[in-house]
Amino acid sequence: MLILTRKKDEAIIIDDKIKVKVVEIDGNKIKLGIEAPDDVTIHREEVLKEILKENKQALKQKRVLNRDYTSRIKEFIAKKG
């Protein structure tokens, strides 16, 4: 992990296209401003973790539904056969 020290109004540039600037310092809180291309997704870490958790749960639910649907199709075919 790269660790940098920045003061208010100072910035870092990532990959020549993402700018992270220290906008405000208030006690132990720092406000960052981020400028990035539209195709770059930016999330707070805790928000991303929640999104990934919800996506994982949705995928599990989809698998259960697909198994149920497949079972019903097999039953239908067996009855017709």
UniProtKB/Swiss-Prot annotation:
This is Translational regulator CsrA. Keywords: Bacterial flagellum biogenesis, Cytoplasm, Repressor, RNA-binding, Translation regulation. It is found in: Cytoplasm. The keyword Manganese does not apply. Coiled coil: none annotated. The lineage of its organism: Bacteria, Bacillati, Bacillota, Clostridia, Halanaerobiales. HAMAP family: CsrA. A translational regulator that binds mRNA to regulate translation initiation and/or mRNA stability. Usually binds in the 5'-UTR at or near the Shine-Dalgarno sequence preventing ribosome-binding, thus repressing translation. Its main target seems to be the major flagellin gene, while its function is anatagonized by FliW. The keyword Repressor applies. GO terms for molecular function: mRNA 5'-UTR binding. GO terms for biological process: bacterial-type flagellum organization; mRNA catabolic process; negative regulation of translational initiation; regulation of bacterial-type flagellum assembly; regulation of carbohydrate metabolic process. Its main location: cytoplasm. NCBIfam families: csrA (TIGR00202), PRK01712.1 (NF002469).
